[in-house]
């Protein structure tokens, strides 16, 4: 395994700060102090606090999403993957919002926007994986209407999961029942 770069080491420390105190607590000076380096060293790797925030947010979602559900279980069908993904996403996003975005009113609007963008970028990656899982699920009916494609179903599923995750009490049981009855033989 390759040795971590100085940038990776700084990013790991930034991750620890954000995980413990929230993104609003992350600062170039604070990170420099935590790592016993000069502020200039941080700026050699991150052009601005916004770039540092973006990279730290990206690392959060990379670790959370890739570790928890970007790797389907062998033989896992599309529906089971979606159920597992929803449960994992619910926990991941709840933790991000409760811990990482606490005191987010202190974050400048641009940094909040960047953090949300990184979240959306990860969702696009997830959708691509869902399409692959759908296409490789031998249990899905082969006589589906032509407009019920892997891409259409995956985008629909992810949009609905995200909508539920934004609600007060996320619940995808109706979505999963509809998918089961539509995609699989009864």
Language-model regions, residue ranges each:
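Generic hydrophobic, amphipathic alpha-helix propensity
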Residues: 3-15, 31, 52, 56-60, ...
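Solvent-exposed, amphipathic alpha-helical segments
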Residues: 13-21, 63, 67, 71, ...
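Helix-turn-helix
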Residues: 9, 17-51, 55
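C-terminal alpha-helix
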Residues: 133, 177-186
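Amphipathic alpha-helical segments used for helix-helix packing
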Residues: 80-117
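Phosphate/oxyanion-binding loops and surfaces in catalytic or ligand/nucleic-acid-binding neighborhoods
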Residues: 59, 63, 88-96, 160-163, ...
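Hydrophobic alpha-helical connector segments
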Residues: 55, 69-95, 150-153
């Amino acid at each position: 395994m390759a040795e971590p770069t100085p940038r990776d080491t700084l990013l790991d420390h930034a991750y620890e700060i954000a995980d413990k105190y929230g993104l609003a607590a992350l600062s170039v000076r604070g990170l420099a102090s935590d790592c016993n380096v000069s502020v200039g060293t941080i700026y050699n790797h991150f052009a601005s606090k916004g770039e540092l925030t973006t990279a730290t947010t990206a690392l959060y979602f990379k670790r959370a999403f890739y570790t928890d559900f970007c790797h389907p279980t062998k033989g896992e069908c599309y529906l089971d993957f979606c159920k597992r993904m929803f449960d994992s996403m619910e926990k991941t996003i709840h933790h991000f919002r409760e811990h990482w975005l606490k005191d987010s009113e202190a974050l400048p609007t641009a940094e909040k926007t960047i953090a949300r963008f990184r979240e959306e970028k990860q969702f696009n990656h997830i959708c691509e994986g869902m399409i692959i899982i759908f296409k490789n699920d031998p249990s899905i009916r082969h006589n589906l209407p032509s407009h019920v494609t892997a891409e259409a179903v995956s985008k629909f599923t992810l949009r609905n999961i995200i909508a539920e995750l934004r609600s007060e009490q996320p619940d995808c049981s109706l979505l999963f029942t509809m998918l089961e009855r539509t995609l699989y033989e009864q």
